[in-house]
């Protein structure tokens, strides 16, 4: 019998997690811990993604904006859920096709979680919970994307930390994709990963303010 990578176990454990109680929208659900996560494999982006793309294990893709071709290829590779972190303005201004409609036409689940680090689209524990739920409910592989995989890397790191991966290991995994300690802060002068978790990470670099 073929042994599935660690991330497959991660998805099963997420599916078994207890749902958040009513009124807990601003709290993330604590799920069963996982022991390890595969190192990201950087993918060729030519004609497929904007800027950056990586596969983590066999079941997770963390990327920049995918093209129509990329979405069709991901469907063929077993992706069943697409999670988009870009805002409506970004999608309207910069994407020459209707992503939601294409994803639906391909028979995949579309999960829209726009984040930008402002009052309208904050980095929040609620987004982390919804992403974890999307992973847990996925019937196949998952694509998590934003514009250049920066926001997606922060959410991915928060997800790993919430699942029990040590902070330094989770940050290293996400940095290998496109997490950067730069000036684009979330609320309270924190990095997005910290706002997704609603806690400070002392080992995370913070640029001078």
Please identify what each model-predicted range represents.
Residues 8-19:
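Bacterial N-terminal signal peptides
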């Amino acid at each position: 019998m073929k042994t599935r990578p660690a991330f497959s176990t991660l998805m099963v454990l997420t599916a078994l997690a207890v749902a958040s109680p009513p009124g807990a929208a601003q709290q993330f659900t604590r799920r069963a811990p996982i022991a390890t996560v595969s190192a990201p494999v950087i993918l060729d982006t030519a004609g497929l993604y904007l800027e950056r793309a990586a596969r983590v294990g066999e079941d997770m893709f963390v990327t920049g904006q995918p093209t129509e071709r990329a979405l069709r290829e991901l469907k063929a590779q077993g992706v069943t859920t697409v999670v988009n972190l870009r805002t409506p303005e970004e999608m309207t201004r910069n994407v020459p096709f209707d992503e939601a409609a294409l994803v639906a036409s391909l028979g995949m689940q579309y999960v829209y979680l726009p984040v930008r680090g402002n009052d309208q689209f904050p980095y929040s524990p609620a987004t982390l919970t919804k992403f974890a739920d999307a992973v847990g409910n996925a019937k196949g592989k998952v694509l998590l994307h934003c514009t250049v995989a920066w926001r997606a890397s922060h959410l991915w790191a928060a997800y790993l930390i919430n699942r029990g991966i040590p902070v330094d290991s989770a940050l290293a995994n996400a940095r290998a994709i496109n997490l950067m300690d730069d000036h684009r802060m979330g609320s309270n002068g924190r990095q997005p990963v910290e706002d997704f978790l609603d806690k400070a990470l002392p080992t995370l670099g913070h640029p001078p303010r």
